[in-house]
Amino acid sequence: MRKKTRLDRKTRGLVLVLLCIVMAAAMTACSGTSNGPEVSNKNSNGVAGGNEQGAEEEELVPEEGAKLVVWESKEQVDYMKKIGKAFEEKYGVPVAVEELAGGEQGARLATDGPSKLAADILTLPHDQIGQAVKAGLLLPNDAFEEETRAAMVEAAIQASTYDGVLYGYPKSVETYAMFYNKDLLPEAPETWEEVAAFAKTYNAPGQNKYAIMWEFVGYYTYPFIGSFDGYIFGKDNTDPSDMGLNGEGTVEGFEFLQSLRPILPMDAADVTYDVKTQLFQEGKLAMNIDGPWSVGAFKDDVNFGVAVLPKAPNGNPTTSFSGVKSYYVNSYTNYPVAARLFAHFASSKENQLKNYEQTGAIPAHKEAGEDPMIKNDPIISGFFEQFKHSVPMPALSEINAVWDPLRAAFMTIWDNPSADVKQTLDQTVATIKAGMQSK
């Protein structure tokens, strides 16, 4: 019996030791010994936060003494100052907004980032992030990745991602759609067949009356590639070694493009931005494929609406090219947690709607796009609907070797109805590959 008693005591002692080890491990795990952002249920003032911007945002705590600098373009400065003030009120972090043209921010980050002279947060168009990532200038959107992916339209996520890693906090989007003159067309045609039927009764070249126009450049003519399952580069335009411009889908799309010549009896080179803008202003052009940047040119002269592009004959929604602007965090920032918090805060549904109200920027946030303010705007809602069927314009530097040969192919195929589409595109791809190798 005594032996059994001693064994029980040893067993109990061993159990106690094991329990202590388990509890110590649990406490270590709860203490958060990783190198990630500090987690708390209080904001920078030590006050537990609400849920209006999301619970995850409230858990991150800005670094003590944090202060931020944001670069913003001229047309966005006043709006951004309001966002900075709201952020400071919520987190106790002052935000200075410095004006810098959007096209200059990436270059300035490259020169000023390593010397700690650049802004903590900046806005970049999506075709500039590849170079910035390769140079190690941007921090990934890691703390808010899951929330960002769920909240933003897919094309904006794709455009803010490089090599499988999400870096951006999408801010606004843009694509082109179809302006239509409501005095000539009370309802926008939904298919190219309907456009062709209207053109038969409306076109009068001698009077400069045309049913529809678009510029014959790669940006505006991409629908005849993407809508037919064609592509420029493989792997969602990330693999320049896989050229799809002479593939089956693109050939089908360009043959369809060639068949549309009767609805626009003009040579491709004659369809310029200035020509179609003037004709639409004069009420002679019924439909004009263009972007939101042209709204101001028409609002005082034309009773117009904006609709999605006509469906392809295969029934697919017509795929356009799009551009995306996102907030990015400078990898050299002294306050990476505060900077992440600000980028997430500024890209929220509420703030994207405020940006729309003040500047007309089209939201990248799905719920913002469905807000009555957007849905009831007959102009912006048309662009937002088309954006849902868009793909980001390729961000690879190799795309620069594509545009001129592709435009030449459009012109050959359009101006010469008997041109062999496959042979033309084979030659185009050969020219592009040669150009890529020479750079």
Report residues per predicted region.
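Extracytoplasmic/periplasmic substrate-binding proteins
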Residues: 73, 82-83, 129, 220, ...
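Extracytoplasmic "Venus flytrap"/periplasmic binding protein-like
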Residues: 86-153, 161, 183-190, 279, ...
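Extracytoplasmic/periplasmic solute-binding protein
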Residues: 167-171, 176, 194-243, 285
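C-terminal lobe and pocket-closing loops
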Residues: 293-303, 312-408
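Hinge/lid segment of periplasmic solute-binding proteins
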Residues: 49-62, 125-177, 187, 192-198, ...
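Glycine-centered hinge/linker elements that transmit conformational signals in sensory
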Residues: 198-199, 239-269
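A structural signal for short loop-to-beta-strand junctions that line the ligand-binding cleft
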Residues: 111-112, 117-120, 148-182, 209-214, ...
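Conserved C-terminal helix/tail region of periplasmic/extracytoplasmic solute-binding proteins
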Residues: 51-53, 389-439
